[in-house]
């Protein structure tokens, strides 16, 4: 342990040699050096486990009055504290960046998700070096640090296997160990995983019972066991950030079946039931009012009868997904308890990084990629009914209806993305620390925010905020430690001023009052939003209106004006200004002012390259293009992928099958268009080519396929429908193999190229692109869904 006098405001702690006698011979009896002491935090510093779920609304969990069983959250709440006024930013990456840095999301460059980054300081997705992360601070103070799960704080141009890794968890963020994914969402059965900065495959397949949440728990338990076995006197900081319950809602059928019939009455009735449970549980004041359903959300009774069983099943699957997640979180906590370390482990269990996701359309979806590509009409009620038993399975990439998201945000208005209202930002949070909190099973209603976590952890550990990190002077934390509330439920709230903003949805909280304005509805992206000055502001008195049910702006215009001015002051202070609700401009790197990896219309790739995101590969959608590969065929029955992009839910692959050159185009997992040469390729060196002649005339059209060997055509084929917008949210491109889920009918294990070697692969796109025909709002809608 570092001496008590060691200053911890300069990190890393400087090495200061102790003056003393220097002898010539080490055998001299006057030779003396102080013993080497490993760096440790102050005595008694707790272990820290921060759990962050994804896309879980305030009203989902039984811990906060919901219908979805979360016995682990319930157990922690019974022995700890429940915070019913804890807030996030209303969106994924901004919440995560704010959590890990103790500063507002715009202060650390995350006014929006990384795909929308601009050159503006509040939206560039680049954390300034003046705002060091919590894990880095803890590591420099002697903590062991680890992260498991989702990281969406890496800009697309930094997310290739070549980094640079400054923004990666195991790079500059400060985690000594990372196991998880770098994206906004993941296929729970076939995720694109990283260990440290290196891509790795899941340890087993979906058919063998793989699920990401279970895997994350296994890895976390293993790491904690090893850490305590080898360094028992060193506390750990573990960040367990699940991909659940973000879509796709993947969970084994038996978990979803636990909720058979629970949601048959529909979202209106479910919302009413949750509201009454919340009041009975004391989670919200007894006098609370339930805000009326907005007209943008259809009533359950107005949904077609043939859709209701499908919609109910969507919610059953989501419920099973959340309970399954809670169960595996319990395994991690049980492992800590079995080692005798639970009493001095500070646990934050944050049930959601924002409100529930209303990005699944009114009907929900079986394969989100259909909606992402503007092809939701392919998922007819008849189709959805035919796959109702497959929701949540490896064959699905599913999401639930907007109506369920609204119900899961009970008792508040709106959902994820809507930073103006509590439905987007208020997330139930549990704090458990037996050694530091005497109170058990109590409610805390002080206003708190995700930026309060970092200062709380430092105070609990007895570590000061650093003034310098890596030679750079630090700006102070913008959050407030919650420790004052741990053992005093009546303590006045210390975090009494907070702005909120996301794509123009904005507001401010000050000493019980909130002034808010919704600028954009998450699922209504037709046309441009109104000018900011025309937004209608609302005013709520939180002392008597917990749920923001009664807008009193017309009764108290002076108070509204006061808070509007306060919002502008805070927005200016924290880089929120200029407000930015642009759509297509922010998705085009050149217009947004951010770098891009890919330039020009050609790209050379080589054997062994893989885990390339769509941002790492030239865009071949809505245009003619070709692939040419130089290969050395060693065996006449050579088999495997030359190059593949995407997976089961959409993509393409050029491959060899028993020596035959083949191509497959997979449209949404619904249609597979295959082209196959009749003859084998001779042993020897060859140039093989795939050419796609796009029909033109719009987006997502078909085209003619030609396969050639050494310039001679060997097969022709046809693709009728193509993806206009995206292959996948997290599947990748790979050379010499397929990865994740297979594009074609081959298995992943059989996709590895054998009997042939690849010298290079070159992609070339034509000049007939129809990308300019993509509606800017469609681009915006797509990007907002994948976060």
Residue ranges and their predicted role:
Residues 578, 583-787:
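Extracellular glycan-associated modules
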């Amino acid at each position: 342990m570092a001496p008590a006098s060691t200053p911890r405001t300069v990190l890393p702690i400087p090495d200061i040699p102790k003056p003393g006698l220097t002898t010539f011979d080490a055998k001299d009896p006057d030779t003396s050096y102080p013993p080497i002491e490993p760096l440790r935090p102050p005595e008694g510093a707790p272990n820290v486990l921060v759990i962050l779920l994804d896309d879980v609304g305030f009203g989902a969990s039984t811990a906060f009055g919901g219908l979805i069983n979360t016995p682990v959250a319930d157990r922690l709440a019974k022995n700890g504290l429940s915070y019913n006024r804890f807030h996030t930013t209303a969106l994924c990456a901004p919440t995560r960046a704010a959590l890990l840095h103790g500063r507002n999301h715009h202060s650390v460059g995350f006014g929006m998700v990384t795909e929308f980054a601009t050159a503006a300081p509040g939206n560039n997705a680049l954390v300034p070096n003046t705002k060091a992360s919590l894990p880095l601070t803890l590591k420099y103070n002697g903590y062991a640090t680890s992260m498991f799960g989702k990281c969406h704080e890496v800009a697309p141009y930094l997310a290739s296997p070549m980094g640079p890794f400054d923004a990666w968890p195991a790079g500059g963020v400060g985690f000594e160990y990372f196991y998880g994914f770098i994206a906004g969402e993941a296929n729970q059965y076939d995720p694109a995983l990283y260990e440290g900065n290196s891509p790795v495959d899941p340890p087993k397949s979906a058919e063998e019972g793989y699920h990401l949440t279970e895997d994350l728990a296994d890895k976390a338990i293993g790491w904690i066991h090893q850490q305590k076995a080898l360094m028992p006197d060193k506390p750990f900081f573990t960040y367990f950030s699940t991909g659940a319950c973000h879509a796709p809602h993947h969970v084994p059928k038996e978990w979803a079946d636990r909720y058979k019939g629970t949601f048959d009455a529909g979202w209106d009735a479910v919302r009413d039931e949750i509201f009454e449970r919340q009041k009975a549980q004391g989670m919200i004041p007894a006098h609370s009012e339930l805000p009326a359903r907005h007209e943008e959300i259809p009533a359950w009774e107005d949904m077609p009868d043939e859709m209701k069983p499908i919609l109910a099943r969507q919610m059953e699957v989501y419920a099973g997904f959340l309970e399954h997640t809670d169960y595996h979180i319990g395994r991690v906590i049980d492992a800590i308890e079995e080692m005798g370390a639970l009493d001095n482990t500070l646990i934050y269990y944050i049930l959601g990084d924002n409100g529930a996701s209303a990005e699944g359309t009114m009907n929900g979806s079986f394969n989100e990629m259909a909606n992402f590509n503007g092809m939701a009409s392919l998922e007819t009620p008849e189709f959805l009914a035919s796959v109702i038993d497959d929701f949540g399975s490896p064959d699905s990439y599913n999401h639930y209806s907007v109506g369920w998201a609204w119900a899961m945000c009970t008792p508040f208005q709106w959902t994820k993305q809507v930073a103006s209202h509590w439905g987007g930002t208020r997330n139930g949070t549990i704090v458990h620390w037996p050694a530091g909190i005497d109170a058990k099973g109590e409610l805390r209603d002080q206003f708190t925010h995700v930026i309060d976590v970092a200062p709380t952890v430092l105070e609990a550990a007895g570590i000061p905020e650093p003034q310098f990190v890596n030679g750079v002077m630090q700006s102070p934390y913008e959050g407030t430690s919650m420790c004052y509330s741990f053992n005093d439920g009546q303590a006045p709230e210390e975090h009494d001023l907070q702005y909120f903003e996301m794509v123009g949805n904005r507001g401010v909280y000050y000493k019980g009052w909130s002034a808010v304005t919704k600028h954009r509805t998450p699922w209504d992206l037709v046309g441009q939003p109104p000018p900011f000055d025309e937004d209608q502001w609302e005013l709520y008195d939180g002392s008597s209106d917990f749920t923001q049910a009664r807008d009193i702006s017309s009764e108290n215009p002076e108070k509204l004006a006061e808070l509007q001015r306060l919002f502008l002051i805070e927005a200016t202070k924290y880089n929120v200004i200029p407000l930015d609700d642009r759509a297509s401009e922010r998705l085009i790197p050149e217009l947004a002012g951010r770098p891009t990896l890919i330039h020009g219309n050609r790209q050379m790739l080589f054997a062994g390259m893989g885990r390339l995101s769509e941002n790492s590969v030239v865009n071949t959608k809505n245009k003619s293009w070709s692939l040419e590969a130089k290969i050395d065929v060693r065996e006449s029955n050579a088999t495997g992928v030359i190059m593949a992009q995407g997976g089961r839910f959409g993509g393409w692959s050029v491959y060899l099958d028993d020596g035959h050159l083949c191509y497959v185009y997979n449209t949404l997992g619904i249609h597979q268009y295959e082209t196959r040469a009749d003859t084998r390729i001779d042993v020897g060196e060859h140039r093989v080519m795939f050419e796609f002649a796009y029909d033109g005339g719009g987006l997502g059209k078909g085209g003619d396929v030609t396969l050639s060997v050494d310039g001679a055509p060997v097969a022709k084929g046809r693709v009728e429908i193509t993806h206009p917008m995206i292959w996948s949210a997290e599947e990748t491109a790979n050379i010499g193999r397929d990865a994740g889920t297979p594009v074609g009918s081959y298995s992943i294990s059989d996709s590895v190229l054998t009997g042939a070697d690849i010298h290079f692969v070159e992609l070339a796109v034509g000049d007939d692109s129809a990308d300019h025909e993509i509606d800017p709002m469609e681009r915006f809608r797509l990007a907002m869904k994948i976060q």
